[in-house]
């Protein structure tokens, strides 16, 4: 194996040279560029990583990344061939990952010092996350590391990530209406109606909607109704349904309450149907992709987003903000959003290395670099020096180009400095990391600066706003300097913290039934959302209930729910054990 050869060579090299090589030296064969094939279950892109990120990786390691996203039977085909790729990124540390471990398709990171010698930053600073993977893997070995990791000393009870469920609304339109009270979803609906009456089209004359959604991120349920349930009731998606971290209860998606009312998921499917029938839901929602929906948000064709990444992150450009436009938090009084906890254990989206790779050390070096503070900042905000830097106090600051590029990702990177020419010539967007996974949590504390990796936590970003910026009005009305500060101070939220839980395996029969049931749920949910009448909606819901419960002699849905309830019981035990250890 190539590892042994390099270890022997390393023993003959001076200690300082070995250290430098392990930390940041180039890998690969001689001066040539090595192509690493990265199979990612999370990627939305397929092809060669390009732009400034490609230049960074080529300069540091002499590598280029060929990204293969999961689609159709891609994973099955690769599993059957016995070769998953060089670097393998998993959506979760559940069934697919464990099957790959059992099949011997993933490297043992501790074999012949691979982690210790070539993953030095992770080895020295992320032991909790590595040990979590050892427990999850089931064979006592470390095969990878998760995402969203926080530093070892910042996982106290009150620590959480940025609020993803931010309840963002076109605040300029909201102020125009006189900032009416929004107590519940009915009040929010009324606000949407008034906004559309006042602004039926965007600046280009195209029709506006309350929201534009997309189906390509659907899973066991349709994503947007599922997410609205999480944003409103403080329950988090779990197996086939939701987990309530307040009551430790599992809630199945097709629940109908004793009084005949719908459970959380069906209630939100009904809400989206209400939007659809009122002309407030983009009619292309069932056929478009995420990037098409994002383009509509950017152009001002939507009023509302559950998510920060699909609202303010898209619309709040400097130009819009300084023109008095912007999306900001207006959360219904009755809403209790879920927010995700920070933990040194990290999340479940794993970085691993395929067992058939010919470049194990190089793969480890690349993953390790992504895990360093510099690597994390560069993949978020661009090349150090060109886009950001540390000031004399060690605090993170944007360059003028970096600030502009992060606000408008279509900004072309340019520089007169010859050291930065290799990163220039294309837009910031075209160089962004396309693997769709990061090792650190964006909201973790950067040990090199003492601030968060998230630019919202930088002292340098807390600058006075320009006159006319709509955020000034929002801040004054909400007595807060940021949306996260407001949501924290509001105090109504639930932290989702799953600790070392990893989803269990399903047997072959359950896998078949699970796929049938979830397909029924998503298919009929969309039909219900786009029903033209109340009668059509009720028929679609009834068909969903009937079909989902028809499989395996009428026991299929119940089997999926029973399996999910057993998993919820395991999670409950893990949570109780973790909290007991903290006290």
How should these model regions be labeled?
Residues 17:
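Terminal recognition/anchoring or ligand-binding modules at protein termini
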Residues 2-3, 12, 20, 24-583:
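Extracytoplasmic/secretory soluble proteins
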């Amino acid at each position: 194996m190539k590892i042994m050869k390099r270890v022997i060579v390393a023993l003959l090299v001076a200690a300082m040279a070995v250290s430098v090589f392990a930390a940041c030296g180039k890998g690969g064969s001689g001066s040539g560029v090595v192509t690493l094939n990265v199979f990612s279950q999370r990627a939305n892109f397929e092809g060669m990583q390009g732009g400034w990120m490609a230049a960074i990786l080529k300069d540091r390691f002499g590598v280029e990344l060929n990204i293969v996203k999961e689609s159709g039977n891609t994973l099955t085909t690769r599993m059957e061939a016995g070769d998953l790729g060089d670097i393998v990124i998993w959506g979760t540390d559940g069934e697919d990952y464990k099957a790959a471990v059992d099949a011997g398709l993933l490297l043992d990171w501790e074999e012949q010092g691979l982690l210790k010698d070539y993953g030095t930053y992770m080895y020295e600073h992320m032991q909790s996350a590595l040990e979590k993977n050892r427990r999850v893997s089931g064979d006592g070995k470390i095969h990878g590391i998760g995402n969203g990791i926080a530093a070892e000393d910042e996982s106290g009870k009150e620590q959480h990530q940025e609020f993803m469920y931010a309840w963002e609304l076109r605040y300029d339109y909201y102020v125009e209406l006189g900032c009416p009270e929004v107590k519940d979803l009915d009040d929010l609906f009324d606000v949407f109606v008034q906004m559309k009456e006042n602004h039926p089209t965007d600046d280009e004359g195209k029709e506006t909607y309350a929201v534009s959604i997309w189906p390509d991120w659907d899973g066991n349920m349709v994503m947007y109704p599922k997410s609205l349930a999480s944003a409103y009731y403080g329950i988090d998606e779990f197996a086939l349904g939701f987990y309530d971290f307040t009551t430790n209860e599992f809630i199945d998606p097709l629940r109908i309450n004793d009084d005949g009312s719908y459970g959380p998921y069906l209630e939100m499917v009904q809400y989206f149907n209400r939007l659809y029938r009122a002309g407030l839901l983009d009619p292309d929602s069932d056929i478009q992709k995420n990037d098409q929906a994002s383009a509509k948000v950017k152009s001002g064709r939507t009023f509302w987003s559950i998510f920060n990444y699909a609202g303010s992150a898209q619309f709040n450009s400097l130009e819009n903000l300084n023109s008095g436009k912007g999306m900001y938090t207006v959360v219904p009084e009755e809403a209790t959003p879920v927010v995700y906890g920070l933990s040194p254990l990290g999340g479940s989206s794993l970085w691993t290395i395929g067992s058939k790779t010919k470049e194990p050390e190089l793969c480890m070096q690349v993953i390790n670099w992504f895990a360093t503070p510099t690597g994390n900042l560069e993949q978020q905000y661009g090349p150090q020096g060109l886009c950001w830097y540390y000031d004399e106090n060690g605090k993170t600051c944007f360059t003028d180009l970096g600030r502009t590029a992060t606000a408008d990702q279509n900004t072309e990177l340019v520089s007169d400095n010859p050291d930065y020419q290799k990163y220039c010539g294309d837009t910031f967007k075209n160089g962004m990391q396309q693997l769709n996974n990061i090792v650190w949590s964006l909201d973790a504390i950067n040990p090199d600066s003492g601030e968060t990796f998230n630019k919202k936590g930088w002292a340098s970003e807390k600058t006075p706003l320009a006159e006319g910026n709509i955020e000034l009005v929002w801040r004054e009305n909400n007595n807060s300097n940021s949306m996260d500060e407001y949501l924290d101070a509001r105090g109504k939220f639930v932290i989702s913290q799953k600790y070392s839980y990893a989803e269990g395996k399903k047997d072959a029969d359950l896998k078949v039934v699970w796929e049938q049931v979830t397909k029924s749920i998503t298919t009929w949910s969309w039909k219900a959302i786009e029903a033209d009448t109340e009668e059509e909606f009720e028929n679609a819901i009834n068909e969903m209930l009937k079909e989902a419960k028809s499989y395996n002699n009428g026991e299929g849905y119940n089997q999926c729910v029973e399996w999910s309830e057993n998993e919820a019981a395991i999670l409950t035990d893990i949570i109780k054990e973790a909290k007991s250890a903290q006290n």
